Each structure stands twice: as structure tokens, then as C-alpha cells.
Amino acid sequence: MIAGIIAVAFEKPTTKDFVWPCWGPSIHVGGISFCMNFVFFLLLLAMGIYIALFYLAFRRPKTIPGRLQALMEMGLEFVREQIVMQMIGPEGMPFFALLSAFFFFIFFANILEVLPGVNLALTSRIAFPIVLAIVSWVTYNAVGIRRHGFTGYMKLVLFPPGAPIILYFLLSPIEFFTTILVRPVTLSVRLFANLVAGHFLLAVFFLGSIALLSSAVTFVFGLVSGAMAVVMVGFEIFVSLLQAFIFSVLSASYIAGAMASEH
């Protein structure tokens, strides 16, 4: 009975549901169209939230901070102590701005998922996590090359200190693929997959609640589904914060590894 009601209420998605049309004229470069659409609007929205909060918090900083300034200072202190100092140490302070930007911007991009009227995390579009992962990848490799030189950095990557020489034929390819190829993939896919999964769960519970509440027979189940949807909203806020933290911590650990004399 319940399955039948849900099946009747369910409208099968089409490919059009995954394509956002342009809101105005587009620019074509090499067969690729660039235009303002819903996803680009989300990027501007996340950037706007990021800039506005920091501007409002620190435009007139006070010795005794107000609520917003205290909240943002608490967030920056968290990044400095729990990410920069824990993963890299005092030498990591030049990367404090980058890691803070990762943490806050990813969180604001993630939290759009539970914002009424938006309900789509910017990071649930794979292109955005890929760009962030590339920035992280370029940063830690540039740090390693600058610290050790290209040859010295490649030596540290390909020949881990302390390993028996006979194992290098096995370890060197693994280290190369892990450091140079796998890390940006895992960084981007981890962030993307977690936010997509959360989006699907929210959609299932909210749409299931609407479908079940439409019938007296399944009304109680609709209430349960609606309650679970509310719980999932809170859980997704936690996941949004957690994924921002994980991305920033991993980026910091990669930078620390590139700076170290030994892996």
C-alpha cells in the first residue's frame, strides 16, 4: 500500500533536471559555454556570505568583541590551533590564510544545501571540489619543490627514507601515484560524494513525507519521514562543518609532508 502510494506520487527525473539553463547571454570558448545560471549564482552567493561575514565582523574590530566578531575570531582560532599548529606547526603560519579560506568557504558552500529556497550544496557539483583540490595540489607540490628543489622533492616522494632498498621498486610507484595523482582525486571525490549523498537523503525524506502525508492511510509514516527530514537537516549541518574541516586538515598534512625533510 505504502509503496504504491509513493510510486504514484513519484515523478521520475529526466536529464533536464540535472541541467541548469542560462539566465542570460552566454560566451562560447572552444565549444564550452559560460553563462550565469543557478550553479554560478550559488558560487556568488557562497562568496557573498564569506565576504560579508568577515567584513561585518572586522570592519570595526573592538577590544571587547561583539557576537559576530567573537564568533569569527573563534573560527579563526580553531583553524590556527587545530589545523595549522597541529598539522604543520609554527612554520605553517604563512598558510593560515589559505587554510582558513578553505575551511570557511567550503563550509559556506556546503551549508547552502539546507538553506530554504536553495537546497543545493555548491560542492555537490564535482567541478567545484576539483578546483579546490587542484589549488591544494599545486600548493603542497610548490612548497615541496621550493623547500627541497625539484630533484630533492622527487627523491623524497619516490624514495621514502628508512625503507629497504629492495622495496623501492614497489614503494616508488605507489608513492608517486599517491602524492602526484591520487591525492587530488580523493580530496575532490570525498567532498563531492558526501554532499551528494546528503542531498539525496534530504530529498528522499522530504519528498517521501510529502507523498505519505497526502493519504490518510500513510499519514503517520509521513510524520515520521518529516521528523527524520528535520533530523537530517541538523546532521547535514554537522557534515558540512566536518567536510570543511577534513579538507583543510588533509591539505595541511600534505603541506607539512612537503615541508618535512623526511616523510
PLM features: what roles do these ranges have?
Residues 1-263:
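Selective transmembrane helix interface/packing segments
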